[in-house]
């Protein structure tokens, strides 16, 4: 088609070669067969040249043409790839590729041109240009080979070809016509497999008068440009016009080729012909011309003014015609089918207008005269239309403009604002009267023709206005000052897919103007164009206020080209986008736009010190640079070569081409750290918000600032800022519910944009201070809330987006939106502040300080925290600390438990948010208390190492207990958050564990009086409300105290202070270190220091580095014999034995422990054949464990440690590997098989399940009677040294040295040195001296078992419980029911002393691997003796009560909730009931505590004295134990404790006013309920870990299962008579019958079942509190398919 030819209309020179040479004007057909090719003479494209041809094809792949430098570096290859044209070229080994967007395998003709210009090569397909550029060192291309078209000959060596694989390219299939090197035809050197097409069409030249024949789309055409003739065959004569001599042609000239009348225009040149002397009046006329250009827009020709004109222009690559004869414009657009007319090829344009009679429909239209207008381009494309009928004459007495005008934008009807750039030829206007050859008149210099600019009358290549791409938002270029005053125009094209960007901006000189604030304000004239949210806006201020004009109705960021044309005349003007015009009128009266300085295109410079940015220009405020393409920039009709400007300025991020990548950039997932990827213009955009990272791919970790309530970061802006749009984002983490996050502040106004935590929510407040500037005042600050419970110490992301009056607040996924009231939208600020608001002059209520962490603060594109840290800005005032630090704000130490202070009343009427941090080694203590009106109160206390939150809102007291994994008195900082919202939902969060409870009824907390911190005044403890357990103050550190948004200074704000209170928190003066305790002693941290537990070391002293009591046994043998009193014989399930020794004997007994006569249980430590070993028997067979590896009779000092737990045992010498023993077999199952046939069938299954759940051998070492040391009584004499003997809390050698009456020494035994002093003057007791600070707890358990599947083992003990009595001295403990003794000696209650090992013991696999192993406890057992005298004494004296009720009955006031750390809550208002299920729901414990201490006096173990003051809290357990407790009245009385140092007593309390039912005087084993498994498998308990380093203890017996060792268990018995013992032994023979009787009896007894929570093993009590009796019950799982419940009860009294 004609519009796709290059240089074929006017400058075509055809030379047909005869003989062997054939011009390509005849065309070539390529068949696509292998080894096809055509070869043309070398194309000299080294620097500047053009190559063009036409082609058509229907295949998608093939080689079009190729040449290279002979295999070195340079080449050029044109090929078909996937139906598109691909250009590859290389210069000096710098290679690039260009691919067209358009597919060409459509069997249509296409025009292709390759233009070379040094390092730049442009591929033009049907008018669409695709440039490619390389940047090598060499500036030209080396060319050696000829040009190959359609394929490369196979005989060429591959090494001689530069491009690898070019020989394997598929051959081209299709047609190629008119191959040209510039304007000349190349010489064909040879071909193979190519057919000549259309021969003979131009052989006989059909053109007359010297016209030149050429082929166009396969058909012959004539070029008449050089003949003086016109027409299809150059046969039409040019009209001779008499009277106009300057237009007449002589007859002689008709047959000669006339000189070409052409000229080159470069955008600022134009021709002007004056018509004032010969005005035009015509009804029919014709305009003809030819043009050639790369430019898309430009004025070609114009004549006329106002409403009578003709305008011909190029608009977006199409030919535009506008004619107005006075009654309205006729507009026509001619576009090619493919491509554009700006393809740098010649195109012919012809416009005709003829008067015609037009018959229309209706009488009004009949026989009317109209002007028929026809426009054609290249003789093919034609558009026809009619002008309005009222006027038919064109009258013009103005000028004829060719190629441009002084002000193209101001010409009437002009669709473009810029002049033409390119070549124009033979511009002719003619009508019935005249013929104006305007091009020739200009060339010959006619007087009426004025030439403006340097017009050259030849056709030269006009440099294309190449598009440029802004690849980053920071990229920009500077343009010269825009000299516009009263009028001006700007036009450009843009193309992008990004929604926001500043395209143009320039402003004038600053002018001081006064605004409504009566203060000077700098204002400037400015002009700007911006893209915001996909819409194009024009902003203009000419001194009287800014106008903002939206120029698009739909979003323009769709990746297509948009043409923008802005024309201004005075105050008014238009902006058109793709011909859609929008008028505008500037504010005020001024018609002058006073600009100064550069105009910025694409963005703004980083240094904006000299710029005054208007607040209305949101993209500038938000730092949105433009990313996309710009082309064809014309200012006042003159082009701006922005490519050259970018290269001259070396503009970073600006590329001199525009191509859109076909692939989406986010498909490769470039964004890291879970950032959101968005596709931009040829780039990906990683949104790092909320990730904690920054950078192009969010690869750099953002800096974190830590704030402690006194810290802040303040950004002081270099100048006062005014904005109407803000983007704010950051992350924060805090445990406080209140605190300032970020705020903008002003020194001159109350303007602020403030974000703060308010009640656990983020509050956004925007105040624009309308009052001071006399604007339309709003109703006050705009406020939005988002998020909830954000004080959870987790990262949360906050984003704020404001656009004028529109507000949006986003917190994580919660979104709140609002619209501001009033007309004022400008925010003024001098500072951006975080943490603390320092600018307070205009703030009525100062927000609370922030305690927490802040990260990634971005305000309008500026990442201020990182900019401040890196020193990129120098206006940063920083008081916060970098890094994710542990924040301890304003710590205060309460050095004693009697220290406290009081503050003003806590204001928490409707809601409450409390936060504090604490650190202590004390297990108990008051932290916070405030009483109120009526019964209202709030208390926070530490009970047994767990936080209790107790409160009463008028409905009765309630308690919520923290469910921490471990006690909190571990000398570590812990965080506590307590909240109460408007719905009366209370929550307690300790570190990461939260408990929540909804309270019905009253919702308001009416507090009065002082708020007490860390304790109470003397006398207040006796009047505390229900459920408050503490009776002493808090000893330790408090920090970061937040009282419902108020951060008090605990010392300065205190109304009253008492005791030792100091700032800071140094903690214990000495702390446990690795070497604090020698010889593997265990270090126990205390607040005032630490203590060492040397029990299992054989050493003594404060740091376990002093030798223990040492005896030397001579050659003749000796014996040290310790005998338990008859009423004080313990039975144990676990034992621990340690002793140091040195010897050279090969055989001897070191220590032997025997049970009462007739029982046969024993434990013996001996040396056999020089090796140490232990043998023990606990009722079945002898069990032996030995150190086989190394003899110990080497005369060196060794320490041996032995532990037993049931049948499991460990033995370790020094630090050698541990020897372990795990027995096999199950005696219970064997005995069950013996008696199975005697059990009724229906009971077989329950009994079998019961035995399987028990799953243990005999595990109890019964009725221990004596300890023999030295082996003389057995004839196996020990000779050598024994030191520091320890057995289950007894240090026998120390006792022997102190002449304990229960010890006898015989034979050759000699004490070495003096007995080590224990705690100075305190004599040695059965309580080890290192345990003087241990916490004692009384635990009495009752357990009833319902036989059912999936239940924990009913009879497996894992803790130090009361196990047996002297009345049950049989080995068949599991089958014998024993009655309690009624003898004079009475019963005795055993008190286990628990000390936790601070070391973590590695877990050992069990049958229940998903259970967390409980922590280490070190029980030390003593007794509370009860005799008839003591019972009567307590009966007469009454039971002690510590509540304000005195000693009258110890009613409800003595009740507290148990289950410390369980997270459960209890409502005191539940009605009393006799239903046992009620007590399975709650775990209760009385608040009457047993005071315990070390013994005073000698070793009278059965009559200890107790002093609570001598005990200090130890590091308590990580996991507690919940047991179910029930005591008979007799037992309660027998265990009552008085505070007078007489016989220890246990309290008697009521369970919520429910009286206890009479029970037998018995104590039952607890039921472990820590896990449940299939009942068909043996159940195993959770075993506690040992108290000492590297010394494992043994687990209860279970075949093949190795467990974490357990703590020792000791029980002591009352005395028994010999007859009773004989009777019990005889009763053993009847065990089977008794078992059947017991099973039958208790199976048919309907009793409630109770589960024991094994996760709460013995929570240690405070040293100052009265040892609490635990009576906790938990919900049992009831069998749904059995009506009767099988009970198994073991009585060990």
Swiss-Prot record:
Query: Disulphide bridges in this chain?
Result: 202-213, 207-222, 224-234, 423-459, 629-658, 666-677, 671-686, 688-698, 1037-1065, 1072-1083, 1077-1092, 1094-1104
Every copy of the Laminin G-like domain together lies at: 28-207, 260-459, 466-658, 704-876, 890-1065, 1109-1309
Asked whether the UniProt record includes Disulfide bond among its keywords, one would answer yes
What main location does UniProt list?
A: membrane
Alphabetical list of Gene3D superfamilies matching this protein: 2.60.120.200, Laminin
Specify where the region named Disordered lies, as residue ranges.
Answer: 1535-1554, 1661-1693
Membrane topology, from the record: Single-pass type I membrane protein
Leader sequence range is 1-27
Q: Which Pfam families match?
A: EGF (PF00008), Laminin_G_2 (PF02210)
Q: What is the annotated localization of this protein?
A: Membrane
Instruction: Tell me the PROSITE patterns matching this sequence.
Output: ASX_HYDROXYL (PS00010), EGF_3 (PS50026), LAM_G_DOMAIN (PS50025)
Q: What domain of life?
A: Eukaryota
What residues bind Ca(2+), as annotated?
A: 308, 325, 393
Q: Does the keyword DNA repair apply?
A: no
The residue spans the entry assigns to the Cytoplasmic side of the membrane are as follows: 1640-1693
Q: Which GO terms describe its biological process?
A: cell adhesion
Outline the extent of the EGF-like domain: 198-235, 662-699, 1068-1105
Its biological function?
Neuronal cell surface protein that may be involved in cell recognition and cell adhesion. May mediate intracellular signaling.
- Spell out the PANTHER family in the cross-references: PIKACHURIN-LIKE PROTEIN, SP2353, ISOFORM A
Q: Kindly provide the name given to this protein in its UniProt entry.
A: Neurexin-3
Species of origin reads Gallus gallus
- Source species taxonomy: Eukaryota, Metazoa, Chordata, Craniata, Vertebrata
